[in-house]
Swiss-Prot record:
InterPro entries referenced in this protein's UniProt entry, alphabetically: SAM-dependent_MTases_sf (IPR029063)
EC number: 2.1.1.-
General function of this protein: Methyltransferase; part of the gene cluster that mediates the biosynthesis of strobilurin A, an antifungal polyketide that contains a key beta-methoxyacrylate toxophore that targets the complex III of the mitochondrial electron transport chain. Strobilurin biosynthesis begins with construction of benzoyl CoA by step-wise elimination of ammonia from phenylalanine by the phenylalanine ammonia-lyase str11, oxygenation by str8 and retro-Claisen reaction to form benzoic acid, which is activated to its CoA thiolester benzoyl CoA by the dedicated CoA ligase str10.
Signal peptide (from-to): none
One Pfam family per UniProt: Methyltransf_23
Descriptive protein name: Methyltransferase str2
Biotechnology section: The structure of strobilurin A was used for the development of the major class of beta-methoxyacrylate agricultural fungicides since its beta-methoxyacrylate toxophore targets the Qo site of complex III of the mitochondrial electron transport chain and prevents adenosine triphosphate synthesis. Compounds such as azoxystrobin (Syngenta) and Kresoxim methyl (BASF) are among the most widely used fungicides worldwide. This class of antifungals are used as effective treatments against a broad range of destructive fungal plant pathogens and make significant contributions to food security.
Annotated PANTHER family: METHYLTRANSFERASE (PTHR43591)
Alphabetical keyword list: Methyltransferase, Transferase
Organism listed in the record: Strobilurus tenacellus
Induction note: Induced in strobilurin-producing conditions (on CGC medium after 6 days of growth).
Keyword presence, Methyltransferase: yes
Tagged with keyword Transferase: yes
């Protein structure tokens, strides 16, 4: 659908083996931080689970193993890479900017990670996603705020230019690099939800925090940034991410003698549909 649709879902990185590996590593880092659970809330015994923006398929695989009796549908504009899948996982090619081909209230659990921030008017897509959640079901949303508090980067101009290019490339595709911080007020204003839990996590990219759980997540984000901004292939959507910017960013990220600090913010939302 994505290849034929007039509406293309924006994504500033090319989907290839390197990107699949980066997405796997990111999933593993987040899963470890969450204690290898999908969410702290009790999801009950879901029978139908939807993963929106499946990427490498890592989350769908985890969900299928945790809930072997559930049907797990992974949707994305790009196919899941060839890999062993549990028997209860299936893939469907869907562009989230198009109407969903599903009945309303047809999924017990829906998950979407780091997708809404890339979309034009993510809240309008989120509203359609909420419609798909069954009464009493759960919607799990993970998203980010690439905070533009760059004061701690004055001594790391290469890193500052790289992060600025990341933010501007998302904006150029009508995405919102600060989408995560809009989740809580939007969800709390919805009359369709009976419970709203949003956890904000300040995630230092540098220096690495002493807390072991947070340190692992920070190290994951550093590697993810290096993989994303240093990607050999960039789509035409990438704005300002020239070879010079890439090389400067990678060079400074590899150094241990530089004095700089920067934090982004992750948001983990678990919301329950009114019964």
């Amino acid at each position: 659908m994505a290849a034929e649709s007039a509406k293309q879902t924006p994504y500033v990185l090319v989907a290839d083996e390197v990107e699949w590996a980066r997405l796997d590593a990111m999933h593993n880092g987040i899963a470890k931080f969450l204690g290898n659970e999908l969410t702290p809330v009790d999801l009950g015994q879901p029978k139908k689970i939807l993963e929106i923006g499946a990427g490498s398929g890592a989350w769908a695989i985890q969900a299928a193993k945790l809930y072997p009796d559930a049907d797990v549908l992974a949707i994305d504009m790009n196919p899941i890479p060839a890999r062993p899948l549990p028997p209860n996982v299936r893939y469907q090619n869907i562009n989230v900017l198009e109407p969903f081909p599903f009945e309303a209230a047809s999924f017990d659990v829906i998950h979407i990670r780091l997708v809404l921030c890339h979309l034009p008017d993510g809240h309008s897509v989120l509203k359609r996603i909420i419609d798909l959640v069954a009464p009493g079901g759960w919607l799990l949303i993970d998203d980010i705020d690439w905070a533009e508090a760059f004061e701690g980067l004055d001594k790391a101009p290469g890193i500052k230019r790289g992060l600025t290019a990341l933010v501007r490339s998302m904006e150029a595709e009508a995405g919102d690099p600060h989408y995560g911080k809009t989740l809580k007020p939007y969800l709390e204003a919805s009359k369709e939800l009976s419970e709203v839990h949003v956890r904000e996590v300040e995630l230092p990219v540098n220096p690495i925090p002493e807390d072991p759980a947070l340190a692992g997540l920070s190290q994951m984000m550093r590697k993810a940034l290096v993989g994303a901004l240093g990607a050999a292939k960039q789509s035409s959507a990438t704005v300002g991410l020239t070879k010079e910017v890439q090389e400067g960013f990678l060079s400074e990220m590899a150094r241990e003698d530089m004095d700089w600090s920067y934090s982004c913010y992750l948001y983990f939302a678990a919301v329950k549909k009114s019964a």
